[in-house]
């Protein structure tokens, strides 16, 4: 399991963050790494993006592995090319982490309707960097509401 922290002191690279990371490591607890850069670096052109920019934490991205299953929560925006550009930094990190554990990657978007497009956009690059990722997960289609 993992813990996603939001208090600014846990991102200041000071004693509080060091104690947090040490404590998580000693207890074999993963630190969830939130990457909301796509949300906060884009123009808010949709109601979902406006809402996300107001609600999603804007915290520095600290790629820290505190246990054997590091967790990355990547929140993409509406612009898939921009998402791909910002995701590139994760390719090498996820591949490196895979050598010593099993990284977890959570991809989502402010408007859930864009989530399948985000997976389609990023998965080819992810698989090239980390062949063990395999094929993109199948996204079930809802045939009807009732």
Predicted regions and their residues:
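Residues lining hydrophobic/aromatic ligand-binding pockets adjacent to catalytic sites
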Residues: 1-146
């Amino acid at each position: 399991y993992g813990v996603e922290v939001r208090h600014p002191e846990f991102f200041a690279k000071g004693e509080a963050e060091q104690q947090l990371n040490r404590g998580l490591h000693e207890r074999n607890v993963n630190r969830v790494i939130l990457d909301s850069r796509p949300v906060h670096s884009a123009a808010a052109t949709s109601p979902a993006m406006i809402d996300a920019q107001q609600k999603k934490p804007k915290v520095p991205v600290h790629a820290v592995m505190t246990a054997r299953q590091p967790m990355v929560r990547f929140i993409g925006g509406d612009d898939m090319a921009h998402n791909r550009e910002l995701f590139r930094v994760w390719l090498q990190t996820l591949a490196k982490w895979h050598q010593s554990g099993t990284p977890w990657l959570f991809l989502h978007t402010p408007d859930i309707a864009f989530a399948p497009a985000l997976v389609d956009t990023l998965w080819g690059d992810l698989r090239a960097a980390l062949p063990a990722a395999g094929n993109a997960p199948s996204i079930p289609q809802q045939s009807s509401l009732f």
